[in-house]
């Protein structure tokens, strides 16, 4: 459908019987109205042509071959001189065969049938609106229960006795037998109601606004009562309040979308276009048919049987009619959703029938596989790898992908700069990989964001925008902090890249979809850009090292171990003095020169800390020097004092990994502080 803003959209919901009839019926040029499928047949076994008024009827759904009717006559499509526009003998219009992809039909149900999605799926919409237990409604739908129909103001037999399901056992079993007696059909139809028709009557009598008002009043009353002291009663009250909220929201949704509650009970069953449920002939003359065709046939068979019972045989017992209505309800349930909360129906080979719900849902369903999974222009796909040097809002695009995505922009740049006379010359320069091509490509990419998407896109953070840069290789580089939003990891995951073309799309990508602007989860507000997986392992390796402090020295022979955690004996042990560094730059420089390892312990000069100088910790060792100064050695720091006990400097015991980690955090905080100062 197309909305008022001329946007194509798809809406799934309940529709009225009049709307179903408008979709499925059509008037052929002779004035005849067609659209109802009345026969459960598909193709004639001799002529191999669709049966009239069957599931593949050409009068209802259109010709199989464009411009050729069922009789074999041919007319030119669109030729106004050709008259008439349909075959007078078979009634088939001379139109294109593509009409069989969207022309629907319908089955006129003899008895109303509840839509299984609204009845059995949780939460049950019908049960919520009627405020009745689901088990009771299911018993009513499948003709296990009956209730009195209060259509007359005068007291009637059943209105005096009430509903069957609430009566004593003698009434429960004797009254149905009384009404099934021959000659009581009119009396039975007036007094009792059962099946989906009973549900439809109750839904039609609902006033949604009164439901909202009454539910709100009851919710307020339950809130004013307060806790009762009984845990079971309190939980019951909470569940009731939650139910009232759901009921009010459901009623508001029906009012907002102009949907009537009784539309959840079907009187007309739509029949899908035949091209969406095909019958294909394979080798050997065998036919392969969609399971939906068999399920439609089952519905038509049972519906026609019920029609015959009601029209031809007036002496049919009521119990037999109710049983046939139950079979029609079960057949429609199987067609719409086979096996919902029960045992699925199987064919002769013990294979489960694939219902309409199975066709449209899941990864291999009609929406995700056929409609949403289409390839589009200006898009690419590749494996993602970690880009540790990237900024949060950047991603690395391989040259091969980037030149294909931005080829039209590069061609325009070459022509504007008079480096190519036409499109053909520009394409040849791109194929030859001339240096000027990559320069123009980088200029184009600087002002153009790209969108990265990882399927399945379950929430809005599944697709985000990034500023692309060129990288070597054939993989997309991604900052590891954005992986949680995509639910991605670097074990072979693939991501799609798209180029926003219009100015509106580019503005949306820059203002709303950039990765550095989506740091919090839209669902619960927790940070979404947090270290995970590879980053956590890297941080652990970076900050790992000896945690025993100064105790692991030459005075403790039990701690003499190498980097492989192997014990070193007295004869082979050589004590390595831990180096001292005045600043972090010297320590990192020594690591780059391979004089020390990443996790080698060292002493780093640190700023004086009042908490250290005021600490009452007892030093492990004290080293005195000839000039009177001495070193107080603690577990994780060292203090140099004068002869007058004045503190000269402090050294902390750390590793190069800890220093690098600290510097990264310090630079990030300084950058954040500068950004805040610029904003103020």
UniProtKB/Swiss-Prot annotation:
InterPro entries, per the entry: DNA-dir_RpoC_beta_prime, RNA_pol_asu, RNA_pol_N, RNA_pol_Rpb1_1, RNA_pol_Rpb1_3_sf, RNA_pol_Rpb1_clamp_domain, RNApol_RpoC1
Keyword Transcription appears in the UniProt entry: yes
One GO term (biological process): DNA-templated transcription
Binding site for Mg(2+): 489, 491, 493
Recorded superkingdom: Eukaryota
Cofactor section: Mg(2+); Zn(2+)
Location in or out of the cell: Plastid, Chloroplast
Cofactor stoichiometry and binding remark: Binds 1 Mg(2+) ion per subunit.
Signal peptide: none
Homology family: Belongs to the RNA polymerase beta' chain family. RpoC1 subfamily.
Protein name: DNA-directed RNA polymerase subunit beta'
Lineage: Eukaryota, Viridiplantae, Streptophyta, Embryophyta, Tracheophyta
Name of the gene encoding the protein in the UniProt record: rpoC1
């Amino acid at each position: 459908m197309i909305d008022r803003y001329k946007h194509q959209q798809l809406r799934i919901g309940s529709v009225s019987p009049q709307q179903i009839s408008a979709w499925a019926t059509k008037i052929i040029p002779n004035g005849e109205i067609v659209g109802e499928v009345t026969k459960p047949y598909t193709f004639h076994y001799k002529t191999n042509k669709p049966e009239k008024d069957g599931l593949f009827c050409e009068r209802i759904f259109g010709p199989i071959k464009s411009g050729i009717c069922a009789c074999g006559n041919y007319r030119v499509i669109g030729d106004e001189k050709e008259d008439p526009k349909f075959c007078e003998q078979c009634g088939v219009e001379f139109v294109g065969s593509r009409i069989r992809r969207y022309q629907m039909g319908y089955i006129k149900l003899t008895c109303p049938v509840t839509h299984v999605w609204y009845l059995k799926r949780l939460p049950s919409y019908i049960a919520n609106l009627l405020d009745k237990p689901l088990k009771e409604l299911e018993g009513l739908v499948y003709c296990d229960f009956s209730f009195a129909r209060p259509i007359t103001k005068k007291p009637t037999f059943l209105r005096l006795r009430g509903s069957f399901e609430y009566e004593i056992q003698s009434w429960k079993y004797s009254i149905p037998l009384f009404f099934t007696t021959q000659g009581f059909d009119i009396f039975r139809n007036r007094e009792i109601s059962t099946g989906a028709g009973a549900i439809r009557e109750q839904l039609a009598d609902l006033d949604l606004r009164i439901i909202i008002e009454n539910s709100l009043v009851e919710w307020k009353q339950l809130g004013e009562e307060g806790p009762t002291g009984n845990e079971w009663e309190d939980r019951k009250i909470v569940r009731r309040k939650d139910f009232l909220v759901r009921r009010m929201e459901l009623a508001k949704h029906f009012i907002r979308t102009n949907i009537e509650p009784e539309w959840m009970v079907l009187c007309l069953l739509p029949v899908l276009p035949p091209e969406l449920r095909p019958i294909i002939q394979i080798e050997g003359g065998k036919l392969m048919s969609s399971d939906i065709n068999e399920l439609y046939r089952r519905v038509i068979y049972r519906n026609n049987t019920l029609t015959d019972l009601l029209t031809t045989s007036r002496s049919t017992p009521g119990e037999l009619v109710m049983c046939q209505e139950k079979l029609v309800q079960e057949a429609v349930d199987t067609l719409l959703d086979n096996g919902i909360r029960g045992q699925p129906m199987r064919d002769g080979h013990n294979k489960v029938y694939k219902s309409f719900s199975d066709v449209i849902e899941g990864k291999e369903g009609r929406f995700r596989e056929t409609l949403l999974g289409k390839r589009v222009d200006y898009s690419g796909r590749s494996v993602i790898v970690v880009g540790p040097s990237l900024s949060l809002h950047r991603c690395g695009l391989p040259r091969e992908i980037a030149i294909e995505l931005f080829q039209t922009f590069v061609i325009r740049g070459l022509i504007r700069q008079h480096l190519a006379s036409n499109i053909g010359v520009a394409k040849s320069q791109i194929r030859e990989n001339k240096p000027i091509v990559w320069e123009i490509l980088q200029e184009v990419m600087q002002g153009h964001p790209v969108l990265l998407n990882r399927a399945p896109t379950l929430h809005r953070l599944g697709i985000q925008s990034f500023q692309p840069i060129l990288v070597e290789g054939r993989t997309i580089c991604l900052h590891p902090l954005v992986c949680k939003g995509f639910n991605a990891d670097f074990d072979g995951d693939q991501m799609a890249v798209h180029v926003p073309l219009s100015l509106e799309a580019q503005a949306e990508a820059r203002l709303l979809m950039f990765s550095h602007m989506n740091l919090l989860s839209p669902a619960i507000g927790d940070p979404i850009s947090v270290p995970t997986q590879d980053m956590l392992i890297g941080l652990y390796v970076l900050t790992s090292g000896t945690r025993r402090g100064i105790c692991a020295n030459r005075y403790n022979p039990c701690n003499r171990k190498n980097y492989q955690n192997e014990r070193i004996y007295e004869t082979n042990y050589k004590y390595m003095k831990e180096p001292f560094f005045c600043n972090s730059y010297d320590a990192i420089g020594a690591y780059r020169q391979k004089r020390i390892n990443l996790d080698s312990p060292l002493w780093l000069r640190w700023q004086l800390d009042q908490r250290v100088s005021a600490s009452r910790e007892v030093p492990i060792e004290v080293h005195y020097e000839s000039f009177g100064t001495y070193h107080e050695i603690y577990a994780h720091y060292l203090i140099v004092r004068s002869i007058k006990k004045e503190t000269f400097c402090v050294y902390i015991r750390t590793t190069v990994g800890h220093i690098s980690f600290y510097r990264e955090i310090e630079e990030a905080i300084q950058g954040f502080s500068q950004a805040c100062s610029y904003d103020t």
